[in-house]
């Protein structure tokens, strides 16, 4: 608000729905799909045709590893994607920015961070992958950059 930027908080019943439908375990994937749907619906109500997500470089790499480890596929989200069914384009303008740089900027500007309301925050597969990368980085300080570049090149040689 102090920057003069209009924003909206979209209230949903996603947590209640997930608690009622899923008894045990993680429901991150379903929750993400439901949040995406809620944002898309709200964007359409506002007459928007683009949604900007704050996914950063670390999210990009972590998503690829999650897909590889838990789904058996080599996938991560693209920087931009058009969804024909909703006529919405998703953009990710921070995809080349490491999380640490965003946190540094946030601290420098004294921006308040919105706390993740997820009851599983800090105890998810994504958090496991984040910690794994942190450990791997101790032996290979450039591992995230190498993984990022490998994803961008998108080739498996001699396959």
Predicted feature locations:
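A short, charged, Gly/Pro-tolerant segment at domain boundaries
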Residues: 124, 138, 142-159
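A short, structure-level motif marking secondary-structure boundaries and short turns
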Residues: 23-25, 86-89, 144
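Short, solvent-exposed coil/turn elements at secondary-structure transition points
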Residues: 13-15, 96, 119, 153
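ATP-dependent adenylation/nucleotidyltransferase module used to activate substrates
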Residues: 1-64, 70-73, 100-108
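Catalytic subdomain that performs nucleotidyl-dependent activation
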Residues: 50, 58-138
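Alpha-helical elements of Rossmann-like donor-binding domains used by nucleotide-donor carbohydrate transfer enzymes
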Residues: 38, 131-132, 146
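AMP-forming adenylation/ATP pyrophosphatase catalytic core
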Residues: 34-35, 81-86, 156-159
